[in-house]
Structures are given as structure tokens and as C-alpha cells.
UniProtKB/Swiss-Prot annotation:
Gene Ontology biological-process entries: cell surface receptor protein serine/threonine kinase signaling pathway; establishment of localization in cell; establishment of protein localization; flagellated sperm motility; protein localization; signal transduction; single fertilization; sperm flagellum assembly
Residues where Phosphoserine is found: 96, 130, 190, 213, 226, 272, 300, 304, 307, 342, 432, 443, 445, 447, 450, 464, 492, 536, 581, 627, 703
Record region (Disordered): 184-207, 287-323
Region (PKA-RI and PKA-RII subunit binding domain): 219-232
Post-translational modification: Phosphorylated by STK33 during sperm flagella assembly.
Basic and acidic residues bias locations: 288-297, 311-323
Superkingdom of the organism of origin: Eukaryota
Classification lineage: Eukaryota, Metazoa, Chordata, Craniata, Vertebrata
Chain positions listed as propeptide in the UniProt record: 1-188
Name of this protein: A-kinase anchor protein 4
Modified residues (Phosphothreonine): T506
Disease: Spermatogenic failure. A male infertility disorder caused by spermatogenesis defects that result in non-obstructive azoospermia. The disease is caused by variants affecting the gene represented in this entry.
Amino acid sequence: MMAYSDTTMMSDDIDWLRSHRGVCKVDLYNPEGQQDQDRKVICFVDVSTLNVEDKDYKDAASSSSEGNLNLGSLEEKEIIVIKDTEKKDQSKTEGSVCLFKQAPSDPVSVLNWLLSDLQKYALGFQHALSPSTSTCKHKVGDTEGEYHRASSENCYSVYADQVNIDYLMNRPQNLRLEMTAAKNTNNNQSPSAPPAKPPSTQRAVISPDGECSIDDLSFYVNRLSSLVIQMAHKEIKEKLEGKSKCLHHSICPSPGNKERISPRTPASKIASEMAYEAVELTAAEMRGTGEESREGGQKSFLYSELSNKSKSGDKQMSQRESKEFADSISKGLMVYANQVASDMMVSLMKTLKVHSSGKPIPASVVLKRVLLRHTKEIVSDLIDSCMKNLHNITGVLMTDSDFVSAVKRNLFNQWKQNATDIMEAMLKRLVSALIGEEKETKSQSLSYASLKAGSHDPKCRNQSLEFSTMKAEMKERDKGKMKSDPCKSLTSAEKVGEHILKEGLTIWNQKQGNSCKVATKACSNKDEKGEKINASTDSLAKDLIVSALKLIQYHLTQQTKGKDTCEEDCPGSTMGYMAQSTQYEKCGGGQSAKALSVKQLESHRAPGPSTCQKENQHLDSQKMDMSNIVLMLIQKLLNENPFKCEDPCEGENKCSEPRASKAASMSNRSDKAEEQCQEHQELDCTSGMKQANGQFIDKLVESVMKLCLIMAKYSNDGAALAELEEQAASANKPNFRGTRCIHSGAMPQNYQDSLGHEVIVNNQCSTNSLQKQLQAVLQWIAASQFNVPMLYFMGDKDGQLEKLPQVSAKAAEKGYSVGGLLQEVMKFAKERQPDEAVGKVARKQLLDWLLANL
């Protein structure tokens, strides 16, 4: 039986990060000496790892559910729980099978994929522990609204994303657009643009690799001749409508045959219909009966036109229509048609009528000669016309930030072969922005720098210069729009920082011995001291600190003008989070900081109008203090002895920003405050970095990498800031466990029904050691939320979970809750980000890390 249960929605309402329920005991299952107790067995099966040939298991699963369970089509967000309804009375053990698909790990969005798997395990425990005996199929992330119930058959909700994306299956054009985007990746076509129809005369066969399997010359000549014929045909019609006369002369060179040849006799159907239609539309009489030619048996078809100059009114009308026609069609296409149409028509008709030794001459031979003769001047005119039209069009397009972002993404995707030059250009752009150059030099965008770095043709360089000039002209006009939307102005700089840091990490790990050469010019003019202690790590640490602080200063300065607008748009929760981080800095990360942070977090989330008013008053009174503290920290760190290489003008610029409390950069400040505390503590421990070691470098790299990832990913989004607040809370306070559970009062009765039932878990999935340990810990967290007194794990033949009982005992001894344990798991996942970015293997397994850090 397949049914949707109303109680399945309760696991979605659990606030996992703030749950204060205690952790349960964990042990490995040993069948020897076990008495027949009231326990439940849950078997979690990852259907993506099932063997296709294992038909007996699938048939058993299908028959037990009394329905058609197609495990191959099971979605990632779905979970199917099958309960054993045939248990015997003398046995107290009840079994359940939970079918699901594991979510792929995402190192950037740790919270999303951890909660996705945790929701699935929680649903499995919830259905297995409930007294209901029906089999349930549940979608993670569904709501009880009528819309989702009505469209549950054809609507799929993506749970892992921050935004709920609905894909309707009854609209086939959406699938077609996706297929078009996949096929036209190399053509730089937009996914929303419909695919262009091939010409009717095109007979090219496209191979799976996207290359033409027929002769390239004849293929392109065929397409080009079809285009020219159509343009000439349209030009004839326009001229006829403008009361111009088109005269066609049929010349019969044979002396014995002077009869007129019908225009419908040529073999080309397109040319015949075009000529016949032109003759029918014109009112002029056919002049001339024929001329003799020196070569016998040859026939030709000539095309010419005469303007009607007898009436001045017709002439003026013709001029007006000609002007409108030239305005409606691109100038480059008109130049192309006027220069090539006549020659193309003559050559085509000659080819179709001339016979040599009884065999026709291929049309491609004659067309190739014509094309080669006109290619140079045609391409030159087309380039000039396109650049002029591009200047007019981009004047409107460059004011659209979405278009600019799309252009930059295409530059990154299409020019991977010039990655070195592009990275150098981006680095120069970032350095010029960080050292505070004049605003006139900032007008050249990242697109121009990348285009100039990848162009080698003189004409392409001229085009890029015109493009940059046009962008500089639009800069002043674009300032008004950028003031109203300051959040999007940081997108390019944030992405540049992310790419530069990732490349820097890769190069640093490859060349650790020569990393001293990476020092920036800002620290190159510093006087060398007498003692040289760990030159490579010392210079790298200084470079990372100065770069991070300058990057923070740059973003604080950029957000000054849009402060008022951002403060109105952003909620007060962001300010509360910044106040929390600032209090943590002032207290030095001790127990008092923990108490202040908990108090601030509770007041920030407490309902009621009076609490909100107090919070607003408290935030308004601390705005100036927090801003001054942040600026003083930056100035103090940059004025230390190792960092006195900074220009004195930068200190004045930072001191001139007393009102730098901007909500759009709160996430950057919070992460910066954490980074500054770590750096300052490490500087005190190592006495000016004279004994800098690998651990200090790792912390610096992690802080800078985390800063760039946050700026690039979240980009001042409200929902993302809330998630960032939850993640950063665990990073700032490793022992943070005192928060409250918002939904604790909404627990259903069947949560309490699970008290007293010991649970045995069996995991049927072939994952690696790290994934298996992470899966077991998440199942431990889910079982603790449902008040399971004792959790057993069976099937640990390789001993990967032998340390889990020790971890559970230590967590219970330290007083950890469900929320605190989940925050520790998130902290472990975030520490693995720098290693995964450079392809390194994790230094510690999850259970070893928990034993060392709990």
C-alpha cells in the first residue's frame, strides 16, 4: 500500500541546529547473549548502489509494498519506508526497510547536503518507530498546501537548492530548451533561444561529435548561395514596389534559333521561380530578341535594372522607401547583397546552362571563384558595419547587469585554453582595485581585460579597444543604477577573488619549496632583517594576511555609498549576527563570549513586538561602536611590524570611514572578525611569526578561502545570510550547545511512543570509509532526536565504526546536544574544504576528529 501520511511532515519542522535534546548511547550489535527485547530493526538501503542483476531483492521489495516500486526511477528527495506487517506474536522485534538515494556532497554548501541526508534518516526513524503499519512514500521538502497536493504527480521540488524550483512535466518545450542548450554549447547560443532551422537545401549529416561529415567547401557554398539568392530576391521585390523597372534579356546566341527562351526552362527550381515571379510583377516589355555569340551552344541569363526617372514624385518615393529599407536591414548585409548578388546570379545561371563535353560543370567550382574574389572586401565591410551596430546595441545591453554577467561567464567557459593570460589579467585588475587607484582606471571591466589578453589579431584588438571605450562611456550613465542595486556591484570582484585564491592554493601545494616567490609587490619594498627564519612560510603568511585585509577594506569602501539603501532592505537579523561576532571578538572567545552570543541569539529570535523594539534600540546604540571596533582592528593589524609596508594613505582612508556599518557586507565583516582573531592569536603565539609553522599557514589559507567563498556564493542574499549565521555560529563557538529548540513545543505524540525501543541499524550501501562514518553519525543524530535510548549498528565487518561507541560516550560526558553535535560535524566538513579544493585526501577521519575535538 502506498500512502502519504500526515505525520511525515513533522521531521521537516525540526530545527536541527538548535535542538537541545541529548544524544543517545551507541554500541555495535553483538547477537551473542542478546535477549529477546522489544527492539526495532531498520535497514537503510541506498538504491543507487544496488546491483541491477539482483532481481529477487527488487521483486521482494515490490511485492511487500503491494505496488509498483521502480527503484531505478526513485528521486533523490524521495524516501520509501516498508514495514514488516507479518511479524509473529512471540517475537518482539519489528523490521523496516528504508529506500533512499544519498545526496552528493557539496563542499561549498555544507549545510544543504548534510540536512538533506539527515532529513531522510529522520523520516526513516520516524516511520519505523511509529505504530502505523502502512507503507509510506514521502518526498523530502513537501508542504501540506493544496498546490503541492494537486500537482504532486507532475511537479518535482528541488530540495537541496535555496530556492524552490518547480519543473512541470506537461510542458515539453522546457525539456526542448534544455536539450537545445546542451547541443549548442559550442555555438554560444542562449538556452532560452529557439534553435535555428537549417536551410531547405542543406543536406549535411552531423556526426555525434558535432563535425560535418560532407565536404566543408560545398556545404558552406551551398548555404551561402542560398542566402545570396534570397537576399537578391528580396531586393528585386523591394525595387519593384518602389516603381523601378527590372528588365530581363534572354539572349539566344545560336544563329539558327532566334526564338525567346522561356525563363522557366533552367534546371534550378529556385532561380526559375524567382525569375518568373519577377517577370510577372514588372509591367515592362521584354526588349531584344537575341544576340549572336562567338561560342556556339552557349546560353546566358543577364540581370539588370533601370530606375524610372521620368517622374520626380516616383523618384522621391523610391528614395524614401530605399532609405527605410536600408534602415531596417543591416548595412553589412546590404553591402553584401549589392556587391555579390549580380555576380552570383550570373555564375549560377551559367553553371546550370553551360555544358562541356556533355557533362555539367559543378556549381561549387564557379561559386568558389566568385566567393574568393569577393571575400576580402565583404568581410571588411561586415566587420565595420557590425562594430557600429554593436556599439549602438551594447549601449543598452551594457546597462543590464545580467547581460554583463552572462558575457563574463561565457568568457570563462569558452577561453579555457588561455587560462594563464586570463588569470594574470584578473590578478592585475584585483591589485589595481585593492591598492585604491583612481576611479577613471576602474572603468575597464574584466571582460575587456580577458578579451585583450586572448586577442592576437590586430582587428580583434581594435574591436576590444572600441568595446572598452564604449564601456567607459557607459560607466557614468550606469552609476545611478548601481547606487540603487549595490549588492550586484560586488559579483565580479568576489568571483575574481575566488578564482585567484583557488589557483593560488593549487600552485602553493605544487611548489611549496619555491613559495617565497609569490610575495606581492606591496611587501617587496620592506627592509630585509638580519635573521632569515623560514623565508617561504613567512612571506606567504604575510602575503595572505595583507591580501585578506586589503580585500576586506576594498569591499567596505565600495559599500559606503549604498549604505542607506541596503540598511532598509536587509533584516535586523544580520545586525544581530554581527553584534554577536563583535562581542565574541571583544571577549576573546571565552565563556563570557559564549554567554553573550547565546543571549544575543535568543533576543534576536524571540517573538513579540516588545522584543523587536528592544532589539532595534540595542542595535542602533551599538552601530557606531561596532564600526569603530572593526576599523580599529583593521588599522591595528596592518600597523603591526610585519605589515608596515602598507601605504600610509590607506590608513587615512580607513580612518575616514566612521560610518561603515553596512548590512550588505555583514557576512564579510563577521568572517573577517573571526579571521582577525585567529591571525592575532597566532601572531602572539609565534612572536611575530619567527616560528611560523604549517598549522598557522593552514589557518590563514582556510580563513582567506572561506572569505572568498562566502562573498562569491552568498552575494548579500537574505536567506543565505541566515544560513551563514548558523554555520558561523558553530565555527566561532566549538562548544556552543546552549541554544533552544524553537519547535520543541510542536512535537507530536508519536515522538514519545518511541521511548523504550532499542533500535538496530543495518546500512546496505557500498560507500567509502568517510561516507560510512558520516552516515552513521547522522543516523545517530536522527535517533537522538527521537529519544531512542540505545542505538546498535550491525554489519561493521571492516571495523570502520569501532570508535563510534567511544565518541558517543565522550559526547554524553561533555553534555552535547543534537544541535551541538551537528555543528561539530559541519565544522569538520568545512575544514575539509581547502583539502578538497586542491584534491588532497582528508587528514583525519570523522570519528578520529570527533574524539580529538569533542
